[in-house]
Design a protein with these regions (language model features):
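Glycine/Thr-rich phosphate-binding loops that ligate phosphate moieties of nucleotide
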Residues: 1-226
Length: 226
């Protein structure tokens, strides 16, 4: 349910394996929402989407999004649950609610992986992320820190920069890993919002309960077909 890989810090005298949580539907959900909101004239940017989400309170007024619409999920033991939107009310919910619920659904799905890592004894205290993708959003960073109950440290890097540094390290352009990454700058540190910790625990628990029910129904239907 998690991926193990040879880490860039691996050495013959100091073995290092990395572990990776992968949720196929996270990034594509947010890009799907962006495409959805750009069906009519007038472009909606990710910055505008993030601003809309910031205006909505925790829990998106009851709206729930499940970002599992991009094929089977290893985290869910290879199940193809499909994406869904739950508790949608046409009178209460608008685009901002959908964006906020999408953010929360992405974070909740990643937190499933964090729960799994915890069972393997992996310490979950601090997260380091690049200033890119969804971590560009202060709202996303705050929700992520609160739901996972971790300190989130944002550095001035992204996937392309990291890949280039790793390749240069492998080509022995740098003397060691410390030299390869010493120029990275910490640009933000986000702590869990303690005022929302209990609320988000309840929201995550409710979200997970619906997911567990969907998985149970999926498994039951599969068994009936055998």
């Amino acid at each position: 349910r998690i991926n193990t890989f040879l880490h860039v810090n691996d050495r013959s005298i100091s073995k290092r394996n990395g572990i990776l949580i992968c949720v196929n539907g996270t990034g594509i959900l947010y890009s799907w929402l962006k495409r959805l909101f750009n069906q009519t004239p007038g472009s909606v940017s990710y910055e505008q989407m993030n601003a809309h989400a910031q205006q909505i309170s925790a829990g998106a007024d009851g709206l729930q999004v499940y970002p599992f619409g991009n094929g089977s999920e290893r985290l869910l033991e290879g199940r193809h649950v499909q994406a869904s939107i739950e508790q949608l009310d046409f009178n209460r919910h608008h685009a901002g609610h959908l964006i906020r619920a999408g953010m929360e659904g992405i974070i909740f799905s990643l937190n499933l992986g964090f729960d799994l890592l915890g069972t393997y004894g992996v310490p979950l205290q601090s997260i380091r992320a690049g200033h890119s993708n969804m971590f560009l959003s202060p709202t996303f960073r705050s929700i992520f820190a609160t739901v996972t109950n971790t300190e989130v440290r944002i550095f001035d890097t992204d996937g392309a920069d990291g890949a280039a540094r790793g390749a240069a390290l492998g080509a022995e352009f740098y003397d060691d890993a410390s030299q390869a990454f010493e120029s990275l700058k910490l640009i933000d540190t986000v702590e869990p919002d303690r005022a929302l910790t209990n609320q988000y625990f309840d929201l995550y628990s409710g979200w997970k309960e619906v997911l567990d029910t969907a998985i149970h129904e999926l498994d039951r239907n599969h068994t009936n077909l055998l």
